[in-house]
Amino acid sequence: MEKGLLLESVSYQYDANAAPVLKEIDIHVPLGEWVAVIGPNGSGKSTLAKLLNGLLLPTSGRVTFNGMSTMDEGTHWEIRQQVGLVFQNPEHQFVATTVRDDLAFGMENRGFPREKMIQRIEEVSIQVGIDHLLDEEPHRLSGGQKQRVAIAGILAVEPSVIVFDEATSMLDPQGRKDVLETMKQLHENGMTIISITHDVNEASQAGRVLLLEKGEVMLDGSPAVVFHEQDKLEAAGIDRPFAYQLQLALQSRGIQLEGALLKKEELVEALWKYKSSN
């Protein structure tokens, strides 16, 4: 049995007369990995996200988590608990009038004892930095705060995987930075992260990147490997991370920096080393 999420020859179409949105894709995401999924609009990214926890069921093929199939009614809700999904618009996930009650909602549905609910609310609110917002109305919060509340609501039910479906796309720069930092911390603590994103700078933070185009996996590898594939990226209309573009521009002017520098911090460090040795 493959641990983690496994998609085997998965295809999906929204109705019988429509073209497939996903075409016989095979993906394995082991537990503990951080995978970013990039691709142009209409490539099937959000459909993939909904297939991962059974919100959608494959037209053909199989989606499993730790051997449990999303098609099996007996394990469907267990998969939903283990594979949480954070949407682009967090307001669609709010059901209560205070943050505290919203965090409690998922646990109540799953029959958590009251004592454990109180404990989990305290733990996850501190973990994502919203403990000072517990008595606030979710709809009055900033975009970044709303996303962190949505993340905390997923964390409260103790999942193994969190799927972020364009979770930073509607946020301002500070909100995006806060949510990305939360992703990093969750991954460092052992959480499996799948980030569906159009932001290549966000994708460069992951340990693995998938490029989807026209419902097929065109690239699958480390950020350094994927973002080196200029022709395939350009064909899909995907830019490279800013730091890598700048590195290539510097190289064209004779400034050679080692490795593929995908993050701003890596580029700054490499430039300091270059300056000190020249």
Curated annotation (Swiss-Prot):
Bilayer disposition of the protein: Peripheral membrane protein
Keywords: ATP-binding, Cell membrane, Membrane, Nucleotide-binding, Translocase, Transport
Single GO molecular function: ATPase-coupled transmembrane transporter activity
ABC transporter domain: residues covered: 5-239
UniProt similarity note: Belongs to the ABC transporter superfamily. Energy-coupling factor EcfA family.
NCBIfam families xref list: ECF_ATPase_1, PRK13648.1
Cited PANTHER family: ENERGY-COUPLING FACTOR TRANSPORTER ATP-BINDING PROTEIN ECFA1 (PTHR43553:SF24), HEAVY METAL TRANSPORTER (PTHR43553)
Record note on quaternary structure: Forms a stable energy-coupling factor (ECF) transporter complex composed of 2 membrane-embedded substrate-binding proteins (S component), 2 ATP-binding proteins (A component) and 2 transmembrane proteins (T component).
Protein name per the record: Energy-coupling factor transporter ATP-binding protein EcfA1
Naturally occurring in which organism (per UniProt): Halalkalibacterium halodurans (strain ATCC BAA-125 / DSM 18197 / FERM 7344 / JCM 9153 / C-125)
Lineage: Bacteria, Bacillati, Bacillota, Bacilli, Bacillales
